[in-house]
């Protein structure tokens, strides 16, 4: 049977159809005939890349079938009715099957797999779908086969419709064919695509002569749904093939300019970047400036699916297109618009003679010759992707990239990513607005995922699709860099320009491109287009982005330039002649504004064509100005960045292209880098530039730093910033670049946006802060920019009024009695200090829990605060809320010495006078504010609060600042122990104040303690000028310091008697001179130290807060709010409490000016030198210790022979202390034992020793010439030189030591050493026995050999008294020594060897030192630690006739004195009662016995005591000669009266009553002998026979009592303190706490004796109890 058949070539022929032959054989035969007669189809099939892998070339025929022309039915077998009828008029079409025959079985199979149901149905018309019923998974072979068949069929349809008709030269006019209006060659030059619309969907129709392809939105959505539900490389290739082989506008231009050849067919590779254009080979140079490669790369327009023209175009049209695009890229400075926004229309004539208009590069991107508008393939695909993503609630791209089925297989995952890259590249090529498309990909984090994948798999960097996508991301920047601004024709350029105007010049109406107001932004002329000439649209884009997205920092920079210019005008009132700026590729150069017009003033003037760059600049900064034109600098930075990132240049090197990887991080990455670079420039300018002429240097440094950062290939913006910060912090050195990175980094962090929130503040401070009042560091609204129309310059308006109202409201809420009108000064100061946001809504919220949070203890299981390190600097929190200003003591006297001068003279006189020196900072109207903070019933506290309010105001800001200083201290510097700035106390009167006795002034400790405990103190800070001192290195500019006087001689520490009137400078301590960049990194602002004019203000904290602070520091609860009652029964000395015994009623101090000295012939040894011990040194013997072992010379003047009238006139010593130091029966042994356990070091304070060296010389008198020779100090003696004496008699109530020395002729001399026993360095400690032939042996002596070979014992006297001491006096009167021979015979005691006790004491001391090591966490030199103490006396106890003004020193607060070091040495607070009772004399027979002798000794008068000593020695010589045979230890063998000399072996001494009546009163257990710990280890302890091991048992008891506490302290267990005011338990301090932590609080290493709580007294009573009359009166009772 003959059938009329039409093939896809348009050929009509008759075919003999036989029904006995299978239908498939007929189809195959027709297909082979089609291929034979169509050479073009043969070539297509040969180059076709998507042939089914498991099928032969001939099996493609299965995609073809026959369709009846009249009914449109498809034939399926040979028995069809059409063949049976055999009508010759029946026409059949041999063509491809429809897509629905392949889509339906795949959809059913996917639905069966996802729903776990079976499906065996398949279309009967598709022979390739018969195997789909057995599929069980999306990746099964049956599904893959169906997808490959669909892909092959789709490829055949597209190729056939595009290229199948190229060789057909016939006209087909058969009426039976499908009607097609565009089927003749006359219209072949136009598009063969038309839009067919139906009520249900839109279709993309390929209306060729044999086309049956209908690509509707439903078909595209079905394909995307298949890819989404069955993601695999095969299914994804189907989608990529669909979009990659649709020609874009550029592809059609390329096809028009070339004939249909094999090169066109090879363009249809996977992700080739466009059909037939060879994009793979040329896309990498997009924007590179190569005219040969980029002529076809203007892909900004959209593409409509269509077919290529059948006829070649004329060569003239091709040349015109190439020349036009080459001019657009190579000549960006001309007036031609960019191809992305303009339309170029060219008329050309095709071979048929018809004219076609080609629209190139327009926004619509259309390419047609019809009036119909057809949707692009991009629109259909993108809409379908959005629909599928919405339907499945998952992003289409991310779903495929994160498919877990393929992520585990590396190769498959890599292939999927590459296919997605190809899809994105083709979608970008087809997109009518590729910028918006990329922005959506950035917002969906798709490109970010690709960047993260590239980190894991480095192979993708070499992938072609990755390189293409990276170039596409950079294409926009290339275009904007090369295209000039055309505001008249390009709307986007107008928008950018208007945004810049609206952000910076919003107060002016938009003036267009020609306005004088552009000069205010820093443009070089009124037409900014001239400035953008070399950077194109890119610089305008960067400026517009900066001003719009970073509005506040942008306005802040503008305001900064205005302020700099204003400061320059204030400093230079001369008229400045404006001179033009000459630029050469933005290496901006300036001309000096001096009268010198030489050409050498031009910097780097290499531009030969700069005539057009010279403008009449009206607002150009002077060459000596520190301001710069912002817009000009921005343009220069854009040019610099474009060169660094090679924007607008050819970039063929892969190494250079790697810098573009940062483009995956975000859509505005280049703009953000521009902002960061501008901040860097501002930071460098701030630290380096001194004038505008420094611009080339600053811009060079900026470029070098950015290049250094870019060389590290940052992958995103944050990585770029981190690398830049690391570079500025010098963690990575900058080669050949000397930059002040400290100031630069500080300014850089200040310009960065602040990310501080409530969580950060709570973490630091543990309390709520009104974050709404936190000012943004970049907030320009604090200084609103206004303009003056007369001068057209910007000005600023202060917001002090708003700040006043804000702070004033807080003042009203905190204190209703406050007068609103009298607080303006304080409010303004608060605004100027930039700390108004510190106001807390309720300052009472601060509690111990907050303190625990600060110190790192875990108080809430949900909140954990990190422990603060011990080396935290003061700026960490101080700068967090702004530096706290200090008071400049403008009128205070600068002289040292004396107390109460300068600041102190006017303060606290009756508690009512305010320091006049502070009135410079206080308005007179503030005198009415006497009723502020009326919350304290105590009158003295009330007065202090009124004073502080007048000085500081009652703003909660002061309380906040107090807390900050409480935590860290003003000079918390662990690297520097010796402070260069000191504070003088203003809380004490001149009578009770004293100058510093060592490197640390006394008031510093009190100041720091008050600061620590939250008490209000009004202490002005008077500091010398310090610039660049200490660890800071002088990092701040000198102009930041308020220097009013260049002389530093007038700036002394504290007020003195000098009364100088010169102003003190506001300067900084070594800690304060350190960099503030860490604080600025947090806050993002630079602190203004010039405006710090307020004094430190301390808030009264609740008592429990103070207890918490003490407990946190010392590991135990301290009842800070309770002062201990005084112990009235015991007198008090300046160093120990309860020193005076009641039995000292007969103790009378004899004035030493009545003592006469004999002029004896004595050869003085030059070693007898006084090397005075500093008063504050622990080595200096405390007065109560020393007085235990010296003679009471109360009535010595009555017993000394008056015949010695020829003596040298003695030097009159100062009057004695008003306090007579006695012995407390109950407290001394406890204090002594505790001092031993605390391991006090006994080394000299050499620094303080030198300060008093001139006052502490012991003057010696000789017969021939009077000469002052100092006696060596005890610290020059070895331990072996210190020999305890057991044959001398000692009392504890005298202040004069009588010493006898023996010269070579056997003559003796008694030397009276007068020492102020109330001084800390008193040296009256030795035992003495005076007689004929004996000498005073109470002082360690050094043995020398005289000329006769005899041993001469020279006494080494130790004195630290600053007053001159009397000379030695020799007396030979023996009659006066016989009066009281038998007074002390009943007081003898048995003497025992105490070596075991000495070992026990040494072991105890070693353990104490070990505990110090454990506590402080390091092996520091315990022997060199200086512990200092203070004495106190009441103001009323000061005696004017006493010449020693240093006796009254303010003590430590009582709570700290008792509890400060308990944790250091293992004392358990809850066992204090037991510890105290263990030393009670009623429970210790030994102590009772020793106390008995002690009281007995005190009943003797000084006169009787001396006579007793003399008579006793005479009896020893005359009556007890038999016993003297055992006392041959005397080193002077020429004298028979030697048995009272010092012996090293006390166990061999005679034990008779006469020789032992006064022995060993210096026993460690005796309360009467609490000598300095310097000599404890050389004295012997005696144990009573009744209790031979009493002392050992007490020691063991003490150790047992503190055992548990030590364990808790070391292990950090929770303490169970019974007497806590709250139930909160604390952990101990870690063992790594350094000793400097205490130094930072108290200013020095301070030692305390641990006393019983019963003996603790308040400061007032302790001060009054030190009065001499009070002590004598109490003791007489």
Curated annotation (Swiss-Prot):
UniProt KW keywords: Coiled coil
Biased composition (Polar residues): 1306-1334, 1445-1454
Database matches in Pfam families: ELMO_CED12
Chain intervals with Acidic residues compositional bias: 922-933, 1228-1238, 1387-1397
Low complexity bias spans: 115-139, 172-194, 307-334, 341-352, 597-616, 934-946, 985-996, 1285-1305, 1475-1488, 1503-1574, 1663-1677
Chain positions covered by the region annotation Disordered: 112-139, 168-194, 264-372, 592-625, 775-801, 888-947, 982-1002, 1047-1075, 1122-1141, 1197-1248, 1261-1404, 1434-1454, 1467-1593, 1654-1677
Keyword Coiled coil included in the entry's annotation: yes
Domain of life assignment: Eukaryota
GO molecular function: G-protein beta-subunit binding; small GTPase binding
Bias (Gly residues): 269-278, 891-903
Domain ELMO: 492-710
Keyword Coiled coil found: yes
InterPro entries listed in its UniProt record: ELMO_dom, ELMO_domain-containing
Single GO biological process annotation from the record: actin filament polymerization
Single GO cellular component term: macropinosome
Coiled coil: 1186-1212
Transmembrane segment boundaries: none
Protein name stated in the entry: ELMO domain-containing protein E
Species per Swiss-Prot/TrEMBL record: Dictyostelium discoideum
Lineage: Eukaryota, Amoebozoa, Evosea, Eumycetozoa, Dictyostelia
């Amino acid at each position: 049977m003959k059938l009329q058949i039409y093939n896809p070539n348009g050929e009509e022929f008759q075919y003999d159809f036989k029904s006995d032959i299978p239908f498939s054989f007929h189809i195959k035969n027709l297909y082979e005939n089609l291929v034979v007669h169509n050479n073009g189809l043969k070539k297509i099939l040969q180059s076709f890349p998507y042939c089914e892998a498991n099928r032969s070339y001939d099996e493609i025929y299965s995609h073809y079938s026959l369709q009846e022309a009249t009914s449109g039915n498809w034939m399926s077998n040979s028995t069809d009715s059409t063949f049976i009828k055999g009508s010759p008029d029946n026409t059949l079409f041999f063509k491809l099957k429809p897509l629905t025959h392949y889509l339906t079985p795949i959809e059913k199979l996917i639905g069966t797999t996802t729903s776990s149901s079976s499906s065996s149905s398949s279309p009967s018309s598709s022979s390739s779908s018969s195997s789909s019923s057995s599929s069980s998974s999306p990746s099964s072979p049956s599904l893959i086969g169906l997808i490959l068949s669909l892909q092959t069929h789709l490829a055949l349809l597209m190729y056939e419709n595009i290229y199948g008709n190229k060789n057909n030269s016939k006209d087909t006019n058969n009426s039976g064919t499908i009607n097609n209006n565009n089927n003749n060659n006359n219209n072949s030059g136009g598009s063969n695509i038309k839009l067919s619309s139906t009520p249900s969907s839109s279709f993309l129709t390929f209306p060729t002569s044999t086309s049956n392809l209908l690509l509707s939105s439903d078909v595209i959505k079905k394909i995307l749904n298949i890819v989404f539900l069955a993601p695999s490389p095969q299914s994804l290739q189907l989608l990529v093939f669909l979009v990659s082989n649709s020609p874009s506008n550029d592809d059609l231009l390329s096809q028009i300019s070339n004939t249909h050849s094999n090169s066109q067919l090879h363009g249809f590779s996977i992700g080739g970047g466009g059909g037939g254009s060879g994009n793979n080979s040329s896309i990498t140079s997009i924007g590179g400036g190569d005219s040969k490669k980029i002529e076809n790369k203007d892909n900004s327009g959209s593409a409509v699916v269509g077919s290529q023209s059948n006829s070649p175009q004329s060569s003239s049209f091709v040349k015109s297109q190439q020349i036009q695009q080459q001019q657009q890229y190579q000549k960006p400075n001309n007036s031609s618009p960019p191809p992305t926004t303009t339309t170029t229309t060219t008329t050309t004539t095709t071979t048929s003679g018809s004219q076609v208009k080609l629209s190139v590069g327009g926004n619509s991107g259309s390419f047609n010759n019809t009036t119909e508008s057809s949707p692009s393939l991009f629109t259909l695909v993108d809409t379908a992707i959005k629909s599928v993503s919405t339907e499945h609630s998952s992003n289409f791209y991310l779903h495929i990239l994160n498919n877990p089925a393929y992520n585990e297989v590396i190769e498959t995952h890599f292939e999927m990513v590459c296919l997605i890259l190809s899809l994105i590249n083709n979608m970008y090529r087809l997109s009518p607005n590729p910028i918006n498309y990329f922005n959506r990909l950035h917002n969906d984090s798709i490109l970010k995922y690709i960047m993260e994948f590239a980190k894991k798999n480095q192979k993708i960097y070499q992938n072609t699709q990755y390189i293409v996508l990276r170039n596409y991301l950079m294409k926009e920047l290339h275009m904007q860099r090369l295209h000039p601004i055309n505001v008249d024709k390009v709307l986007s350029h107008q928008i950018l320009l208007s945004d810049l105007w609206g952000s910076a010049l919003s107060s002016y109406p938009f003036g267009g491109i020609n306005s004088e107001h552009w000069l205010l932004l820093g443009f070089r002329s009124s037409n900014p287009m001239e400035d953008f000439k070399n950077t194109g649209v890119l610089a305008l884009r960067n400026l517009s982005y900066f001003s719009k997205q970073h509005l506040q920092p942008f306005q802040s920079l503008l305001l900064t330039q205005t302020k700099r210019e204003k400061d320059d005008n204030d400093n230079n009132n001369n008229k400045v002649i404006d001179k033009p700026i000459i630029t050469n590729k933005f290496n901006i150069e300036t001309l000096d504004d001096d009268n010198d017009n030489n050409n050498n003033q031009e910097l780097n003037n290499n531009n030969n064509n700069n005539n057009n760059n010279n403008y009449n600049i009206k607002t150009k900064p002077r060459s000596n100005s520190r301001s710069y034109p912002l817009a000009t600098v921005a343009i220069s930075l854009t040019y610099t960045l474009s060169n660094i990132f090679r924007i607008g240049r050819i970039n063929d090197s892969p190494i250079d292209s790697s810098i573009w990887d940062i483009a995956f991080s975000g859509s505005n990455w280049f703009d953000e880098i521009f902002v960061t670079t501008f901040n860097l420039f501002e930071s460098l300018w701030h630290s380096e530039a001194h004038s505008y002429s420094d611009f080339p240097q600053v811009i060079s440094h900026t470029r070098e730093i950015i290049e250094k950062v870019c060389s590290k290939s940052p992958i995103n913006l944050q990585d770029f910033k981190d690398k830049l910060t690391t570079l500025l912090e010098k963690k990575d050195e900058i080669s050949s670049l000397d930059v002040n990175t400290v100031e630069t980094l500080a300014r850089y962090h200040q310009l960065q946006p602040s990310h501080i929130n409530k969580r950060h503040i709570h973490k630091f401070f543990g309390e709520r802060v009104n974050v709404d009042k936190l000012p943004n560091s970049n907030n320009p609204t604090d200084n609103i920019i206004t303009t003056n129309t007369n001068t057209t310059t910007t000005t600023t308006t202060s917001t002090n009024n708003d700040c006043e109202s804000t702070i004033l409201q807080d003042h009203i809420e905190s204190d209703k009695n406050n007068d609103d009108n009298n607080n303006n000064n304080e409010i303004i100061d608060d605004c100027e200090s930039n700390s108004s946001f510190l106001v807390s809504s309720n300052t009472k919220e601060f509690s111990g829990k907050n303190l625990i949070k600060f110190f790192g203890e875990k108080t809430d299981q949900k909140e954990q605060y990190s422990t603060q390190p011990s080396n935290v600097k003061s700026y960490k929190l101080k700068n967090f809320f702004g530096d706290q200003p200090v008071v400049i003591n403008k009128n205070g006297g600068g002289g040292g010495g004396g107390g109460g001068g300068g600041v102190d003279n006017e303060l606290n006189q009756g508690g009512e006078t305010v320091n006049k020196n502070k009135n410079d900072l206080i308005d007179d109207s503030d005198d009415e504010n006497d009723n502020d903070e009326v919350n304290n019933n105590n009158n003295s506290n009330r007065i202090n609060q009124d004073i502080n309010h007048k000085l500081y105001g009652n703003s909660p800001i002061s309380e906040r600042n107090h807390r900050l200083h409480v935590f860290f201290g003003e000079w918390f510097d662990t690297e520097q122990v010796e402070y260069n700035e000191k504070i003088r106390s203003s809380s004490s009167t001149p009578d009770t104040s004293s100058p510093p006795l060592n490197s640390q002034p006394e008031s510093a400790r009190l100041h720091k303690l008050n600061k620590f405990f939250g008490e209000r103190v009004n202490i002005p800070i008077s500091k010398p000028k310090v610039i660049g001192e200490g660890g800071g290195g002088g990092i701040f500019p000198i102009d930041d310091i308020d220097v009013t006087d260049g002389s530093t001689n007038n700036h002394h520490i504290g007020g003195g008697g000098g009364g100088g009137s010169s102003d003190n400078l506001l300067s900084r301590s070594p800690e304060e001179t350190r960099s503030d960049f860490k604080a600025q990194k947090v806050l993002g602002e630079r602190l203004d130290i010039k405006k710090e004019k307020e004094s430190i203000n301390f808030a009264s904290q609740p008592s429990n807060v103070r207890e918490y602070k003490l407990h946190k520091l010392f590991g135990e609860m301290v009842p800070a709010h309770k002062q201990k009652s005084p112990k009235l029964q015991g007198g008090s000395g300046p160093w120990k409490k309860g020193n005076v015994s009641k039995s000292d009623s007969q103790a009378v101090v004899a004035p030493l000016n009545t003592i006469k000295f004999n002029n004896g012939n004595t050869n003085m040894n030059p070693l007898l030198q006084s090397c005075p011990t500093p008063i504050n040194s622990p080595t200096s013997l405390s007065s109560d210790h020393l007085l235990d072992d010296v003679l009471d010379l109360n009535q010595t003047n009555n017993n000394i022979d008056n015949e010695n009238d020829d003596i040298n006139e003695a030097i009159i010593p100062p009057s004695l202390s008003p306090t007579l130091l006695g012995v407390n029966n109950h407290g001394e042994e406890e204090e002594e034992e505790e001092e031993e356990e605390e391991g006090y070091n006994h080394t000299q304070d050499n620094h303080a020793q030198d300060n008093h060296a001139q006052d502490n010389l012991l003057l010696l008198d000789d017969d021939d010439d009077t000469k002052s020779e100092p006696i060596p100090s005890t610290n020059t003696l070895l331990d072996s030189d210190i020999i305890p004496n057991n044959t001398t008699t000692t009392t504890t109530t005298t202040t004069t030591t009588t010493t006898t020395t023996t010269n070579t002729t056997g003559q003796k001399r008694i030397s009276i050493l007068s020492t102020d026993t109330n001084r800390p360095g008193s040296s009256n400690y030795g035992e003495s026995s005076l007689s004929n032939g004996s000498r005073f042996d109470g002082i360690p002596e050094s043995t020398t050999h005289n000329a006769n070979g005899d041993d001469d014992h020279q006494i080494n006297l130790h004195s630290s008294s600053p007053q001159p001491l009397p000379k030695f006096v020799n007396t030979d009167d023996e009659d006066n020594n016989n009066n009281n021979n038998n007074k002390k015979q009943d007081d003898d005691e048995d003497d025992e060897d105490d070596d075991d006790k000495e070992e026990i004491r040494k072991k105890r001391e070693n353990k104490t030192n070990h505990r110090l090591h454990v506590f402080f966490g390091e092996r520091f030199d315990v022997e060199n630690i200086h512990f200092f103490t203070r004495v106190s006396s009441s103001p009323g106890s000061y005696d004017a006739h006493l010449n020693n003004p240093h006796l009254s020193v303010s003590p430590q607060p009582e709570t700290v004195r008792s509890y400060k070091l308990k944790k250091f040495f293992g004392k358990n607070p809850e066992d204090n009662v037991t510890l105290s009772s263990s030393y009670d004399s009623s429970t210790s027979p030994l102590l009772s016995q020793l106390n008995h002798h002690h009281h007995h000794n005190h009943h003797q008068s000084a006169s009787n005591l001396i006579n007793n000593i003399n008579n006793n020695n005479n009896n020893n010589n005359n009556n007890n000669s038999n016993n003297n045979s055992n006392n041959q230890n005397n080193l002077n063998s020429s004298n028979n009266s030697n048995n009272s000399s010092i012996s090293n072996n006390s166990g061999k001494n005679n034990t008779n009553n006469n020789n032992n009546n006064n022995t060993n009163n210096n026993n460690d257990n005796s309360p009467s002998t609490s000598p300095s710990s310097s000599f404890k280890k050389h004295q012997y302890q005696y144990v009573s026979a009744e209790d031979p091991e009493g002392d050992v048992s007490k020691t063991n008891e003490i150790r047992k009592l503190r055992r548990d506490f030590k364990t808790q302290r070391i292990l950090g267990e929770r303490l169970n303190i019974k007497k806590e005011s709250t139930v909160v338990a604390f952990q101990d301090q870690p063992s790594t706490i350094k000793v400097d932590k205490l130094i930072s609080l108290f200013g020095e290493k301070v030692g305390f004796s641990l006393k019983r709580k019963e003996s603790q007294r308040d400061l007032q009573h302790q001060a009054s109890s030190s009065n001499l009359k009070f002590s004598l009166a109490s003791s007489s009772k």
